[in-house]
């Protein structure tokens, strides 16, 4: 029995010894594992340079900085992508479209000329320098945000004078008309040898030219063809337009004073003429007895015409024969336009009565003075398919001199402020089926003209008068949706007298800093303005052709005043020049 007990005790001792060695082994393994792990962590921290806990605190900051760098890089890349998109999707197609338009205009002009050459009617293909491609007849400044009057004219720039001046003290050059297409420009004025008041004898100067850039980068107007119509005809109130066949001109032929003409019983003789690219001039009488059968006097608007849809469009005005269909359809019609923030205090009924009377001023025997638009098909045959549009007097004021303008895809009629309303007016015009429709006008309250009382520059109430002066505005600044924002022009900055010509940019209520021709006492008269861009330099220029007093050689000298349009912020009414 003792032996059995000893055997059991021995087995227990062996089992206990095994458990002890197992524990020692496990502890050793665990110790080695911990040591190995500690060495590995130490090595890793050493290799990362993060040997202290304070280094770990900076890790989030470093991550944030890295994130900012990545975001900035992505943002820069996005800017590049945006610029590429703008260039590819917007600017390049627009540039191509402008180039295409100019090429198509040139091709159209050439096709007309080829047909003309086949009919022995001349040959030639003038075109502006490439620097101007896409910069003529376009929306030159498209800006939704800037103050319109932050754009302003520079001082007048010296350039080549393309307009002949009087050469004697009794000479007189007056009534300039100008129009410029994508390929060439046209200019005309009246020449009187014995003083500006001679209404029976005159010549008509007519010229065709192109825009050039000099070797030093200066703009100049280069006359290629010109003619002085020195014959027995007395052309008056001529309007000119640049068309694919040259320079089309509409004139009346006067044999009496304006007052005598309005008191006559028959319409005024009118001719459609053309200076071709070959330098030859031809003209044809219009059938005024049919075209102006209800009129006793009819004159072109003096301002330039416009080539639209294969036709040339001119502003015309004159007197209607009483009780004819054209006269009776306007009976009782009127429109009242109001000054900005300066309401007429007269009773409404009185205003309406005076507005109605304004269309029949006493100076012209009580005839209704009517606005109209004449379009003529442009072909090798002059005077082809003339169509007269007479707009309702619920839109237009008393008939007056005017101009048809095309800028981009928009058409406008400027109407001289011969009636009571002093601020410049531009009527939007739509064209369809050879006729035109006028819409409510843009008005430019600070772009006034001098006039006799009660229709002076500050006048605000309807009245009957024949006054004012021709000073057209040119559409310069547009919204991106093609709505007109601002114009450029040269106004006569006087209340009653034709004094102080001053150029500026105008919005509907105010004007920019101005550039004066000279002191406030200088005498002036008609001004007509046109703007364009030198695409190569992205500089915008405006040309104002102005009648300026010139007492030594003739009563007036017609001067082409050239300015660059500059940009400033918050500057108004500064004096320059």
From Swiss-Prot:
Organism in which the protein naturally occurs: Newcastle disease virus (strain B1-Hitchner/47) (NDV)
Predominant place of localization: virion
Gene behind this protein: HN
Catalyzed reaction equations: Hydrolysis of alpha-(2->3)-, alpha-(2->6)-, alpha-(2->8)- glycosidic linkages of terminal sialic acid residues in oligosaccharides, glycoproteins, glycolipids, colominic acid and synthetic substrates
Keyword terms: Disulfide bond, Glycoprotein, Hemagglutinin, Host cell membrane, Host membrane, Host-virus interaction, Hydrolase, Membrane, Signal-anchor, Transmembrane, Transmembrane helix, Viral attachment to host cell, Viral envelope protein, Virion, Virus entry into host cell
Single GO biological process annotation from the record: virion attachment to host cell
Subcellular location: Virion membrane; Host cell membrane
Topological domain spans for side Intravirion: 1-26
Name of the featured protein: Hemagglutinin-neuraminidase
Enzyme nomenclature, EC number: 3.2.1.18
Virion surface-facing ranges: 48-577
One MF term in the entry's GO annotations: exo-alpha-sialidase activity
Domain notes for this protein: The C-terminus (head domain) is involved in binding the cellular receptor.
Family note: Belongs to the paramyxoviruses hemagglutinin-neuraminidase family.
Subunit structure, as described in the record: Homotetramer; composed of disulfide-linked homodimers. Interacts with F protein trimer. Interacts with host CG-1B; this interaction inhibits viral adsorption and replication rather than internalization.
Region feature (Involved in neuraminidase activity): 234-239
Topology of the protein relative to the lipid bilayer: Single-pass type II membrane protein
Residues spanning the membrane: 27-47
CDD domains, A to Z: HN (cd15469)
């Amino acid at each position: 029995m003792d032996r059995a007990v000893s055997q059991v005790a021995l087995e227990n001792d062996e089992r206990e010894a095994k458990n002890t060695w197992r524990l020692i082994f496990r502890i050793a393994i665990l110790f080695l594992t911990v040591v190995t792990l500690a060495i590995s962590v130490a090595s890793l921290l050493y290799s990362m340079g993060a040997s202290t806990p304070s280094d770990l605190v900076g890790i989030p900051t470093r991550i944030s900085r890295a994130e900012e760098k990545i975001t900035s890089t992505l943002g820069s890349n996005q800017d590049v992508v945006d610029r590429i998109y703008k260039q590819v999707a917007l600017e390049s197609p627009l540039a191509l479209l402008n180039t295409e338009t100019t090429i198509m205009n040139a091709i159209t002009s050439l096709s007309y000329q080829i047909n003309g050459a086949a009919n022995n009617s001349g040959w030639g293909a003038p075109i502006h320098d490439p620097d101007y491609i896409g910069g003529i007849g376009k929306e030159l400044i498209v800006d939704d945000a800037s103050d319109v009057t932050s754009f302003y004219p520079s001082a007048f720039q010296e350039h080549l004078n393309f307009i002949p001046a009087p050469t004697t003290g009794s000479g007189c050059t007056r009534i300039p008309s100008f129009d410029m297409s994508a390929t060439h420009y046209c200019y005309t004025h009246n020449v009187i040898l014995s003083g500006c008041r001679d209404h029976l004898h005159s010549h008509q100067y007519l010229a065709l030219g192109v825009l050039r850039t000099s070797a030093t980068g200066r703009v100049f107007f280069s006359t290629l063809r010109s003619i002085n119509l020195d014959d027995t005809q007395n052309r008056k109130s001529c309007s000119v337009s640049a068309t694919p066949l040259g320079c089309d001109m509409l004139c009346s032929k006067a044999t009496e004073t304006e007052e005598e003409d309005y008191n006559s019983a028959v319409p005024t003789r009118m001719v459609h003429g053309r200076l071709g690219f070959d330098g030859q001039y031809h003209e044809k009488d219009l059938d005024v007895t049919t075209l102006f059968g209800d009129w006793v006097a009819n004159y072109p608007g003096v301002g330039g015409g416009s080539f639209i849809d294969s036709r040339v469009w001119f502003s015309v005005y004159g007197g209607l024969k009483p009780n004819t269909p054209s006269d009776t359809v306007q009976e009782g019609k009127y429109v009242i336009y109001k000054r900005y923030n300066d309401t007429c205090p007269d009773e409404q009924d009185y205003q309406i009565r005076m507005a109605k009377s304004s269309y029949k001023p006493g100076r012209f025997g009580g005839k209704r003075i009517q606005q109209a638009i004449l379009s003529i098909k442009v072909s090798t045959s002059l005077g082809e398919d003339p169509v007269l549009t007479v707009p309702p007097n619920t839109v237009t004021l008393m008939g007056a001199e005017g101009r048809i303008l095309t800028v981009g895809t928009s058409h406008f009629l400027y109407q001289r402020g011969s009636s009571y309303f002093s601020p410049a007016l531009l009527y939007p015009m739509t064209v369809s089926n050879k006729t035109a429709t006028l819409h409510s006008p843009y008005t430019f309250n600070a772009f006034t003209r001098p006039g006799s009382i009660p229709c002076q520059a500050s006048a605000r109430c309807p009245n009957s008068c024949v006054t004012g002066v021709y000073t057209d505005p040119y559409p310069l600044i547009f919204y991106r949706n093609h709505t007109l924002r601002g114009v450029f022009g040269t106004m006569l900055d006087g209340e009653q007298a034709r004094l102080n010509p001053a150029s500026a940019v105008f919005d509907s209520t105010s004007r920019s800093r101005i550039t004066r021709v000279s002191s406030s006492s200088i005498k002036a008269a008609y001004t007509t303005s046109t703007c364009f861009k030198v695409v190569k330099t992205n500089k915008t220029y405006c040309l104002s052709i102005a009648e300026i007093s010139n007492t030594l050689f003739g009563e007036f000298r017609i001067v082409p005043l050239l300015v660059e349009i500059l940009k400033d912020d918050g500057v108004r009414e500064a004096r320059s020049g």
